[in-house]
Amino acid sequence: MVPEMRRRFLQVGTRRVHYLRAGEGPPAVLIHSSPANAFLLQPEIDYLARMYTVFAFDTPGFGLSQALPMQDVTVADLADALAETLEAIAMPRCPVFGSHTGAAIALELAVRHPARVSGVVLDGVPAFTEAESATLFADYFRQIPVTDLGSQYAAAWTRFRDQSIWFPWSSRLPENLNGYDLGPKESTHHWVSMYFIAADTYEPAYRAALLHYGPKALEAAAALEVPAIYTATDTDMLFPHMARLPPLKAGQEIRHIGTSYEAKRALIAAGFARFGGASAAPPDRDAIGYSDNLARQFVDVADGRQIHLRHAGRVGSDTVLLLHDAPGSALALEDLVCSLSKTAFVLAPDLPGCGASSRFLRQAPSIADYADDIADLLSRLGVADVAVHGIGFGASVAIELANRHPGRVRKLSLCGVLLPEPEERAWLASHYAPPIAIEADGSHWYRTWLMLRDSLVWWPWFDRRKAAQRLAPANFSAAHIHRWTLDVMGSRESYADLIYAALSHDARQALARLTVRPGLVLGGAVTPLSAYDARLAALLPDVRRVGVPAEGLLL
C-alpha cells in the first residue's frame, strides 16, 4: 500500500515554501530537477515513504514555492535557501537525494551545511564545461510568450516533446538524439504543466545549474566530507559527467545502475539506510493564522483528502467565506480576498476537485456533499459562523450550506445562481464540462483555453449563436485566460464534478427553504450564471440587491 501523501506550506522568512510529506519513520529530503517541481519525484516518494518520512520541497521559483528575491541566483543561494527551510521546520540531520538541478543543490547543501546532512545520493550532478555550456545552451532558455491568441500551448508542447527527442532540445542534430524512445504524451503534458507553473520564475535557478555550476560542481565534490553516492542511468545525458568527478573520499562512491529506475530507487533506499540520521521526523510547523498578505495552506479533511485554502486578515475578526465559480478555483478571488481582509478574516477554499483541493473519493458527489465538506472545514479551523458569498456554481454550495448548517451562516450573498429549466438542465449536462483528455499533439491545451475564452462571449459557451452572446465586458487579457487555463488543467480529471453536482441540484427548492435572508449581487460579468438573474430576482423579490462588488452584503 502506498503511504498517504500530504501537501503543506511553510513560512520561511518572507517566502512561502510548498512541500510534499509522506510516510512515517526517520526523515529524508528529496530535491527535484528543473524546470519541474516536487511532484516529478512521486515514484521516489511512494517507494521511500514505506521506510521514511519523506519531505520533497518545491525549490524557490518552482511549483508553489515563492522565488528568491534576487535575479542572479547561484546554486549556493538555492542551497542556503534549503538550509533555511530545514531550519524553519526544525529538520534534524538526515539523508538527502537530489536529481540534476536538485543534485547540484544537494551537493552544495552538504558542502555548505554539513551538519544538516547525514549523506547524499546525487543523481546526475551537472558538470558541464564552460565551452559545453556556451554551445549546448545558447538557445536553451528560449522564452515562450503568453499571447492573447493562445500560441503558447503549441510552442510549449513542441519544446517539451523535443526534449524527449534531442539534448539539448534546441539543437536538432543526429548526434544529439536521445538514446531512448519518445516519451509518452502524459510525460510531455506533465512537463508542460510544470513549466507553465514556473514560467515567470524558473530561469535564474535553472541557468545557475546548467550554465554556471560545472566547474563549481567539481570543486564542491572535492570539498565534500559527508558520505555520498553518485549515480545516473546510462541514458541520462549527465551520465558521462560522473567520469569528471575528482577522487572521492572514504564513504563516497560512484554506482552504475544501467537503465533501471527501480534500481535507482533501491539504491537511494540503501544509501539512506547506510547514512542514517535522526529517528523522528519534525511535525509540520505552519498553521492558519493572521496574515497581512494573502497566504495559502492545505487543511486535512475527511477520507484522507485535503482542501487548499487561501486566507488573509486577522483571526478573531468577523469571518467571510468565499465560494468560487466553476470551472476554476479560488485563484479567481484573490483580489476580493485581499480587499475584504482589511476588516475581516477571509477564507477562500478551492472546492473539492477544483484547483489544488483533493476530489471526493465517491463518484458523482452532490451539492450536499460539498456543503458538508465546507462545514467540516470550518469546524477544523475552529470557525463558528461566517458571512458566505457564493459565486456561480459556488452559489449552489453556499445555499446548501445555509440550509444544512444554518448555525454556521450568519449572512448569505449570492452572485449568479444556476436556475435552468429541465430541458436546459439536460442540455447543459451533456455539453458544458467536456472531458479533458491528453492528446498526443497537445491540442487539449488549446481546446481548454478556447472553451474558457468562449465562456466570456456566449452563454452557454458551446452555443455560439448571436442570440447567445453575453454582451458583457470581460477580461480577455493573455495573462488572465492563461492563468485560468492552467488552473483548470491542474484539476482536469475532476474540474467538472462541481458543475455536474450543481446541475443535479434544485436551487429553486433550496432557495425556498432558506432561513437566512440572502443578498443578491445582480448584473455584471463576474459569472456566466448571471444569465439567470431575472429568474433569481423573481424568486426573491424582497431581498437586498446590489451591483458588484459584494462587500456591502458581507461586512
Q: Where on the chain are the PLM-derived regions?
A:
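Conserved HGGG/HGGXW glycine-rich cap/lid loop of the alpha/beta-hydrolase fold
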Residues: 11-67, 85, 92, 305, ...
